[in-house]
Amino acid sequence: MRPEKLDAAAIAEQLHRMEGWVLAEDGGSIWKAFRFKSFAEAFAFMTQCAFAAEKLNHHPEWFNVYNKVDVTLSTHDAQGLTELDFKLAAKMDQAAEGRMPDHMK
């Protein structure tokens, strides 16, 4: 079953609960920049997120350089944001806990 695209009010409500996630200018995706203590921590984060993404059958667009992981989430089938994006965002936030230096949270 195809996920349903969220309306602006539902997106705003979801974002209000999420720390650090930003709505893209076009309203069709959310993004967050994660910074870790080391490359190993960034890679461990990505590995944990990859397993979560597989379970949800929803995959991020991400970019990694050393200790930085920039993530963009959207649901291409719905041409916008769905509950899947916010579920994966929450899983990513959980995976990042304890891996990021306090000054980078």
Curated annotation (Swiss-Prot):
GO terms for biological process: tetrahydrobiopterin biosynthetic process. It catalyses: (4aS,6R)-4a-hydroxy-L-erythro-5,6,7,8-tetrahydrobiopterin = (6R)-L-erythro-6,7-dihydrobiopterin + H2O. Keywords: Lyase. Pfam families: Pterin_4a (PF01329). GO terms for molecular function: 4-alpha-hydroxytetrahydrobiopterin dehydratase activity. Its EC number is 4.2.1.96. It is an enzyme of class 4 (lyase). InterPro entries: PCD_sf, Pterin_deHydtase. Belongs to the pterin-4-alpha-carbinolamine dehydratase family. This is Putative pterin-4-alpha-carbinolamine dehydratase. It comes from Sinorhizobium medicae (strain WSM419).
